[in-house]
Amino acid sequence: MARLWPALVLFGLLAGCQSPVRLMPTPVGFTKGEADPFEKAGPALQTTEVPVLYATNRLVLIEKPEPLHTILPSQDLRMGIAHVRVGDETLDWETLHRMSTSDDPGERPIVHLESLEQMAVLKADEEVKNSAEAQAFFALVNKALAASHNPELLIYVHGSNNTVPRAAAQAAQFRHFMGRRMVVISFMWPSAGSLLRYLTDVNNAAATVDPFARLVELLAANTNASKIDVLAYSAGAQVTSPALAQLGAPRPGETRDAQRARLRLGQIYFAAPDIDTRRFVNELGTYVDLTDRVSVAANLNDSVLRFAAIVGRASRAGRPNLSELSTEQSAFLVDASQKMQFDIIKVDPNDIPNLPESSHAFWYDDPWVSGSVGTW
């Protein structure tokens, strides 16, 4: 316990001073002049506004004049548009484009949520066919897909110590560096937004599994997305992995091929996943064959996951201790990597310039790593 106190003190100092989201460093591939991710972005997209869709199961305290989201989970799904902007009114598109296609050393602008435009509330027992609001939301998703250069849909699932504005900003900057050519939904599960309330986040993530699984099924059933991709960061794996395992159970009489065609799961990317390694492997076996690919990006020196392993009393999938696995689990991982499009991406600070050895945010904070994420 004595060794844990310095970490607890540091976490306590940081808990009340969450920094704003700044535009992530430009991926290396975009700074060499080899490719301009915004080449196909039409005039309507050449703006500092980067709206993304959102869905949340946060309980709302009051509805008007606008919903006040709490840190409590519910079984309802709220969906709409998150209006996000990069920088303030003085930043123009030309400057943002230059910053996004070069290794400009200047201070990065803040990415901030201006407003949430709630379009629909779908109760836990309510069907889309009985909700005009939900139908309108999914029609908007289809309209966005039709206008996009990429027919796939990406769901971003944030980690712990997060807030609604932060979740929206992270999803928006990811969409921005995808050349704004992909439809992105930020799934804002009820994180308490404090490092000191990590265990609250763990409990809330568990309470969010059913709503997230439902969202994936609703998107598959009500949109024209060719594939549904998921990017889960850190404790977002505690929502995503068990939800996918739940979806891995077929409906009565459903064949595996029919299930695969119904769900249309594409690339599932776990960035620094904060979830028990053994649990992750067990759940992976229930759904990996339904996807195009499952990837885990792991830094074996990740300091955040070292702390999470102490709290959870088990190594995390983003910093795995493979000796914890049974013989059967180890054999499955080998088989999955050879036959089922599963891979572990080792993020080694010794091989990546200027990457902090203990980095947890490497997937968006490092220009060498972030370029490998945005390959959809």
At which residue positions do the language-model features occur?
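Sec-dependent signal peptide recognition
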Residues: A2-L8
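C-terminal motif of bacterial Sec signal peptides marking the signal peptidase cleavage site
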Residues: L13-G16
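Bacterial signal peptide processing site
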Residues: Q18-P20
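Lipolytic serine-hydrolase domain surface
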Residues: R22-E127, A139-L140, A147-S148, A168-A172, ...
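Alpha/beta-hydrolase fold active-site loops
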Residues: E152
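The conserved beta1-alpha1 loop
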Residues: I155-G159, S234
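Short substrate-entry loop that stabilizes the transition state in hydrolases
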Residues: N162-A167
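Gly/Ala-rich beta-loop-alpha elbow adjacent to hydrolase catalytic centers
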Residues: F212, A232, G236, T240
